[in-house]
Amino acid sequence: MAAIFRASLVAFATLASCTDASKLLGFENKRHIIPNSYIVALKEGLPERDFETHMAWVSDVHSANVALAGGASTSGVKHTFKINGWKGYSGSFDENTLHELITNENVDYIEPDRMSHIASLDRKFALETQRNAPSWGLGRVSHRQGNSRDYVYDSTAGEGVTVYSIDTGIDIKHPDFEGRASWGINTVDDIDEDGHGHGTHTSSTIVGKTYGVAKKAKIIAAKVYDARGRGPDSATLKAIEWAVDHAQKNNHTGKAAMNLSLVTDSPRAVNAVCTKAVEAGIFLAVAAGNDNRAVTNESPASADKVCTVGATRLGDQKAGFSNYGRLVALYAPGQSITAAFPNGRTGTISGTSMAAPHVCGVGATIMALEGVTPQKLCDRLKQLAHPSVRNPGPNTTNKLLYNGSGQ
């Protein structure tokens, strides 16, 4: 594997010296690159007929180069993407094919496909009150002051809103979901279950009966990470494409949310499709990341129009691990959060992965209650939030998520 990886870097250096290197993005960052695997973005507005012609050309070029090499060392196109006007594809290509892709007039840019990972550290209201809620985050987001464990929320509780969980899958049989969780797509393996636990935990925080914020919303699993909490960025792109298509076909746009408690190293493509998803009518809550640094190129935290969430701990301090900076929209509880785990269990874990679901859940509640559009929802949440976060970090908001309960 090391030899293959070094060879791919040599190929990149050779290509960059003799082609339009401006189309090659992110190759200088060697972290988590999958050898000979690429994400290819096509130029904005490419007509469907030209897209189909291009894909046939790619197939022909790959087949010809495999024949010249005396056999298949790469597999060609794996996924195609059409996401609210953004078109592209991913696959495994040799150096000769990559050279032809770079020089093709329809190609906008090419990024290496990478293994990305979850963003956790461990394994006039009709109000209702959940007394002594089992997760401190629920009490915190429903009170201006931080001294209550009761969760106070509007009785609509996200009813009529569909949430897409881009994660490790969901244990849909867990009693916390009351039958409101279902499977949508699996783009990483052939095991339709949550072998890690992260996706069940985040989904429980969003919609769970006991541990959740929006207790009447529905949630759909789009599995992009395996039992190790890892998967290629192309799997994430394919899942987002599926979610946008599903929302559009089922009239969920305008009343849909998506949670991305993950961090990738392919910012251009992932950011582009996340922005397209918001424009299509889906609210996106995303984790800021856990490196205790300013959000810059982390994706999807740096994408336009998403709602990027930092994490706090008890006492309204920024969690020591949480990223910060001007791209953070607001903070939410993210340290030592208790929620459902697979096989009927519960788990307590930390990360901005745990903060984003609180925002996704409150977002679903506000969408159902006020009819705020997904494109304007993050601004509404910032308007409701209160300035409680201590030491939020340089050039960072001190706004803490609040559901507007009046408490």
Curated annotation (Swiss-Prot):
GO cellular component entries: extracellular region
GO BP term, example: proteolysis
GO molecular function: serine-type endopeptidase activity
Stretches assigned to the Inhibitor I9 domain: 37-118
Domain Peptidase S8: 135-407
Gene3D superfamilies: Peptidase S8 propeptide/proteinase inhibitor I9 (3.30.70.80), Peptidase S8/S53 domain (3.40.50.200)
Active site (catalytic residues): 167, 198, 353
Domain of life, source organism: Eukaryota
Glycosylation site residues: 251, 259, 395, 403
Cleaved signal peptide residues: 1-21
Record region (Disordered): 388-407
InterPro entries: PCSK9_ProteinaseK-like (IPR034193), Peptidase_S8/S53_dom (IPR000209), Peptidase_S8/S53_dom_sf (IPR036852), Peptidase_S8_Ser-AS (IPR023828), Peptidase_S8_subtilisin-like (IPR050131), Peptidase_S8_subtilisin-rel (IPR015500), S8pro/Inhibitor_I9 (IPR010259), S8pro/Inhibitor_I9_sf (IPR037045)
Alphabetized UniProt keyword annotations: Glycoprotein, Hydrolase, Protease, Secreted, Serine protease, Signal, Virulence, Zymogen
Keyword hit for Disulfide bond: no
Keyword hit for Protease: yes
Function, in words: Secreted subtilisin-like serine protease with keratinolytic activity that contributes to pathogenicity.
Family that this chain belongs to: Belongs to the peptidase S8 family.
Name of the protein in its database record: Subtilisin-like protease CPC735_024010
Protein's organism: Coccidioides posadasii (strain C735)
